[in-house]
Amino acid sequence: MIPVVIEQTSRGERSYDIYSRLLKDRIIMLTGPVEDNMANSIIAQLLFLDAQDNTKDIYLYINSPGGSVSAGLAIVDTMNFIKSDVQTIVMGIAASMGTIIASSGAKGKRFMLPNAEYLIHQPMGGTGGGTQQSDMAIAAEQLLKTRKKLEKILSDNSGKTIKQIHKDAERDYWMDAKETLKYGFIDEIMENNELK
């Protein structure tokens, strides 16, 4: 169930679903697994807000366990494509593709709430049953290319070397807010809508 908010206007009352009301304030909620439908919705909202006024920041709140690499990179590419700065605010968790998206916010405008967590790891993939060996080799090669691409993005976003990212992402690498700040993925820890 999506909450509805009532707003008083000069013409009377107007009801909005909560996400539409937040969008009026340039707030986008990226929650749950990153997948194509969710990514298309996020991209449409980014493009809409940028077309509306590209001199104002967009606020992207993130609570995601990650998901599809292609869907996540489509969001990141759109964040980089538009003129508006995209502030990222991690609440809860930014894991896997969630980390790639969150760390790709405008430099100096990447935030995290104090009890949120970050996770980096190598990308996962599979070919499913009944796959012939040559297709498995192709899938493995593509997975290596994807890993290199994601490690480059994380390196650019954190200031860490690709070698360090590769080492840390070999297994699940969890970070709390202070560790994420020290690592370079965020710029500030936010508490009570104030920077800490």
From Swiss-Prot:
One of its GO terms (cellular component) is cytoplasm. Keywords: Cytoplasm, Hydrolase, Protease, Serine protease. InterPro entries: ClpP, ClpP/crotonase-like_dom_sf, ClpP/TepA, ClpP_His_AS, ClpP_Ser_AS. Belongs to the peptidase S14 family. It comes from Streptococcus mutans serotype c (strain ATCC 700610 / UA159). GO terms for biological process: negative regulation of DNA-templated transcription; protein quality control for misfolded or incompletely synthesized proteins. It is found in: Cytoplasm. This is ATP-dependent Clp protease proteolytic subunit.
